[in-house]
């Protein structure tokens, strides 16, 4: 059974790449009102390997300390 972070990644990762890019995160946020620039800044801040996407480790590094989810 996947962890909460793995389940989140799988639900947002529409192209099955194992990563989340700006467009996928924007789509997941739906009508949140966040603009693309803000979402890209968030990804850039947490994108430790600088590939323009968030992978499972990068998501865990952000989400686990922030919300305690596994």
From Swiss-Prot:
<keyword id="KW-0677">Repeat</keyword>
<feature type="binding site">
    <location>
        <position position="19"/>
    </location>
    <ligand>
        <name>Ca(2+) 1</name>
    </ligand>
</feature>
<protein>
    <recommendedName>
        <fullName>Calcium-binding protein 2</fullName>
    </recommendedName>
</protein>
<feature type="domain" description="EF-hand 2">
    <location>
        <begin position="34"/>
        <end position="69"/>
    </location>
</feature>
<keyword id="KW-0106">Calcium</keyword>
<feature type="binding site">
    <location>
        <position position="47"/>
    </location>
    <ligand>
        <name>Ca(2+) 2</name>
    </ligand>
</feature>
<dbReference type="InterPro" id="IPR011992">
    <property type="entry name" value="EF-hand-dom_pair"/>
</dbReference>
<feature type="binding site">
    <location>
        <position position="24"/>
    </location>
    <ligand>
        <name>Ca(2+) 1</name>
    </ligand>
</feature>
<keyword id="KW-0479">Metal-binding</keyword>
<feature type="binding site">
    <location>
        <position position="49"/>
    </location>
    <ligand>
        <name>Ca(2+) 2</name>
    </ligand>
</feature>
<feature type="domain" description="EF-hand 1">
    <location>
        <begin position="1"/>
        <end position="33"/>
    </location>
</feature>
<feature type="binding site">
    <location>
        <position position="53"/>
    </location>
    <ligand>
        <name>Ca(2+) 2</name>
    </ligand>
</feature>
<dbReference type="GO" id="GO:0005509">
    <property type="term" value="F:calcium ion binding"/>
</dbReference>
<dbReference type="InterPro" id="IPR002048">
    <property type="entry name" value="EF_hand_dom"/>
</dbReference>
<feature type="binding site">
    <location>
        <position position="13"/>
    </location>
    <ligand>
        <name>Ca(2+) 1</name>
    </ligand>
</feature>
<dbReference type="Pfam" id="PF13499">
    <property type="entry name" value="EF-hand_7"/>
</dbReference>
<feature type="binding site">
    <location>
        <position position="58"/>
    </location>
    <ligand>
        <name>Ca(2+) 2</name>
    </ligand>
</feature>
<dbReference type="InterPro" id="IPR018247">
    <property type="entry name" value="EF_Hand_1_Ca_BS"/>
</dbReference>
<feature type="binding site">
    <location>
        <position position="17"/>
    </location>
    <ligand>
        <name>Ca(2+) 1</name>
    </ligand>
</feature>
<feature type="binding site">
    <location>
        <position position="51"/>
    </location>
    <ligand>
        <name>Ca(2+) 2</name>
    </ligand>
</feature>
<feature type="binding site">
    <location>
        <position position="15"/>
    </location>
    <ligand>
        <name>Ca(2+) 1</name>
    </ligand>
</feature>
């Amino acid at each position: 059974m996947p962890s909460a972070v793995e389940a989140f990644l799988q639900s947002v990762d529409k192209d099955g790449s194992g990563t989340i890019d700006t467009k996928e995160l924007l789509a997941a946020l739906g009508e949140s009102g966040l603009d693309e620039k803000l979402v890209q800044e968030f990804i850039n801040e947490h994108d430790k390997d600088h590939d323009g996407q968030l992978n499972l480790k990068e998501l865990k590094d952000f989400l686990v300390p922030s919300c305690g989810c596994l």
